[in-house]
Amino acid sequence: MTQSLCKKGGLGRGLASLIPTGPVDADSGPATYGPQMGNTAADVLIGGSAQKDNAMGAVYREIALSDITENPCQPRQVFDDEAMSELVHSIREFGLLQPIVVRPASGSCGDTRYQIVMGERRWRAAQQAGLSFIPAIVRATGDDSMLRDALLENIHRVQLNPLEEAAAYQQLLDEFEVTHDELASRIGRSRPLITNMIRLLKLPIPVQRRVAAGVLSAGHARALLSLEANPEVQEELASRIIAEGLSVRATEEAVKLANHEVNRVNREVITPVPQRRKPICMPGLQDVAERLSNAFDTRVMVSLGKRKGKIVVEFSSVDDLQRIVDVMTTYKT
């Protein structure tokens, strides 16, 4: 127990020795944690620049958990219970090994409060661990940087599920009006990855929920996107994947078979079967057919189309054919 307390105390003193604590003297200029490259960590990747007039820098403080509120731009909506339990246990044993990042925010009664920029998971775990105060770096962060900072922290920690990551990418594209290529270069991700992740938002909502819950992987979801059918068929295949435990490869094969069937049905619907024209009925045709049948001693059919007619003489064998030819020759002579 003593060892744990020493670890906690040592960590706090180490951070405090590196980062200034307490209020900042306005005349002496802001105390900063490391080199100032911008108001936020995202400035380095997204391309922002700090304005000298409102640059506040970063200050280390121990802040009451009750004075901190959530990040409204937090892209992550699902906090894994098992991972959270492990973090809570670690905090109880060793303390919080990394401070969270917050920004000043006025309370409802004018009191000083703080809003999380990075570290909401650590803040939640500290509450569950029974801590009253939490180490934090207080840093001025604009509203337009809240989502960027939270997204960068989460994707580089691999904590977002595929749907949360896709929604965050889409929000960045909408808010900052950049292309997929520009966003990829600024956050250190490949353009195909961003494009493929955003495509997941086209899945039916029930399928999206299963991806967010981790029941379906991003690979399964991308395979379902290739299904050339209505959303109901995608949902049915998603249920089959879960029930049968299909691999991504097996899902891709199932999608190929389904697409082949859909294309076959579409061809049958689009290409009408040509209807046979009914022969023109004229008085006397049947009489001619009967007379020829009697003459050749075989079945003879006579039909008349729109432009031309046709006589069909049946025979049962080569000898029978020769017999009919002989009869025709006799009539000719």
From Swiss-Prot:
Top-level taxon of the source organism? Bacteria
Protein name per the record: Probable chromosome-partitioning protein ParB
**What InterPro entries does this protein map onto?**
Chromosome_partition/occlusion, HTH_ParB/Spo0J, ParB/RepB/Spo0J, ParB/Sulfiredoxin_dom, ParB/Sulfiredoxin_sf, ParB_dimer_C
This protein's GO cellular component annotations are: chromosome
**GO molecular function list:** DNA binding
Tell me which SMART domains the record gives: ParB
Listed transmembrane segments: none
- What does the protein in this record do? Involved in chromosome partition. Localize to both poles of the predivisional cell following completion of DNA replication. Binds to the DNA origin of replication.
Q: Name the keywords, alphabetized.
A: Chromosome partition, DNA-binding
Biological process (GO) annotations held by this record are: chromosome segregation; positive regulation of sporulation resulting in formation of a cellular spore
Q: What family does this chain come from, according to its entry?
A: Belongs to the ParB family.
